[in-house]
Amino acid sequence: CKGIDKIISKDPSGDLTEQFDVHIPLLSIPGIFNTEVDTIPSNGPYIVPDSTRVAEWKDRLEVHDKSYKIGLVWASSPDNRELYHKKSCKLNHFEPALNIHGLSFYSLQKGPASAEIDNLNNGTKIINLDSELKDFSDTAAAISNLDLVISVDTSVAHLAGALGKPVWLLLSFVPDWRWLIERDDSPWYPN
């Protein structure tokens, strides 16, 4: 990446593997660059998933039918309990929509919240991909085969935006600053 000589990571214990000159939290970068709404670089899509994985996921998702395919994420990571309750909702709130003819829902939900699928009424249709999404490249390949992603404010929403997929983002009443509450779109992603 232009301007970045090297990315230094932490080892499994959380210690840095090397010394470095500068550290900046990711969400501080727009402030450092004096970013304004009209200077946000949103030329997307800027992430392209592995074509072999995309083809594998196409076969996996085409098995079910030719309907409009929607990925769904209803909960953020439970690791941050305060944000979890502000950003997450329960899957059963979506239950009326899950059986609409012509729509196929695929759960992109990871972690404990994916178990909520087991609590839905019999006959409610949502395909749980939790065990098949081994890493973020699987998630990217699966999203590439969907028509829409509906998500709470999580990394999956950002990934879908970076892939150029349409995203319906479910925000809390007082959302994070980057979503600009006076708008109904996002300048961060052109889709």
Where are the regions a protein language model picked out?
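Catalytic machinery of carbohydrate-active enzymes
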Residues: 1-191
